[in-house]
Amino acid sequence: MDKVILGDNQFFAVNHLSDERSRAQAVRFKEDQSILDVLDVAMDCGINTFMCTTHDRIANIIALMKKNPEKYKDFKFHPCMPYAHKYANAMTELGIVGTLKAYIPGNIMAVASKAGIAYVRKDFPTLMELLIDAEMKMFEGMNTPVIFLQNVIVDLLMGLGMDELFVHYAEYIKKKYNAEPGFITMNMPRMVDMCERLGIENPIICSSINKMGFRMSGSIEEYEEYLTSDKKFRPIAMQCLAAGALKPQEAMAYVCQFKKIESVLFGASSRAHIQQNKDLIETLSAKATR
């Protein structure tokens, strides 16, 4: 994985501390081209990996990229699924059949039959496969080396003890999409232990890691213990800036001290901030001591 990854919160008015800033972002990025312009800036700065939700507008961005395939041939997406709001809105506007037609590839009657039988039988692995295929439809023809399961699902399944679905997810992603499975969680230590117990080897785990403990379940000390341990996992640090509560230098100095952290995910929309964060991550990671 690349050391530096750009996230998408800034494009879809997600700010965990400021509603005012969220509204400003919504206005700025109301046009798809404005998002692509920022991705172009990131590429100019040397960032070629974009970790994003499966928001409908991502499909529009991909459509724009496909008009210039040579330019984006080395660009990588890390899809994060599911995007729950998308399905809730579609059910309201299109109904059940309309939602299936819109998001699930293949013959609608065959898919509906498969989904119906799976639901009646409580065949959750089959339902999961259908939803994965629906979410991945927009990424056809693009580079997707890692495909993530969102924390809203990961942490729910962990809480319910539905461990077998993690194994099925990992196997399906590898087999169907020739990609590595990734897991986003607000409880990194528990996720590491669960993957170890289930035999999911050297998992990619994306979790909030910052010096304030922002959106980190468990103590900072426990996270640090795992990040300096011999446990086999590949952590991606997100929420490093604690939604803007920390300055970049201070935030990245903390995160980048850990040698085990393979990638750092951040959101920014100006050339200056993108370049600043990239330079900090690369420079400070080279000096990692723990």
Protein language model regions, located:
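Active-site mouth loops of central-metabolism enzymes
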Residues: H16-Q33, V111-L131, G159, L241-L246
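Active-site gating/metal-coordination segments in enzymes
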Residues: G98-V154
